[in-house]
Amino acid sequence: MIGSKKKIGILGGSFDPPHQGHLKISKIAINKLSLDELYWCVTKKNPFKGKTFFSLSSRIKKSKLLTAKVKKIKIKFYEDKIKSKYTVELIKYLNKKNKKTQFYLIIG
């Protein structure tokens, strides 16, 4: 990757629970966009839904189990670090910390 930026996709969500649909869209994005990695950015709670069904730690654990065979998918949690649940703040944070990375927001 000399002279080129690392390509990382961002798929945000509550993953409550993580499921095959999340995995499928992730694999498609990795292949179609030639991503080096894809981050599943788990949020504490979906602001548009009521209560969560599973705890944050359970959702992170289930996400890791579901994606274990796809080495390019990484499970991340940033809300406490960036003090925000908003995607725009996450993208600002990641861009500031990773100057040599091109981020792709995956929406599905």
Task: Indicate where each model-derived feature is located.
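Nucleotidyltransferase catalytic core that binds NTPs
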Residues: 1-108
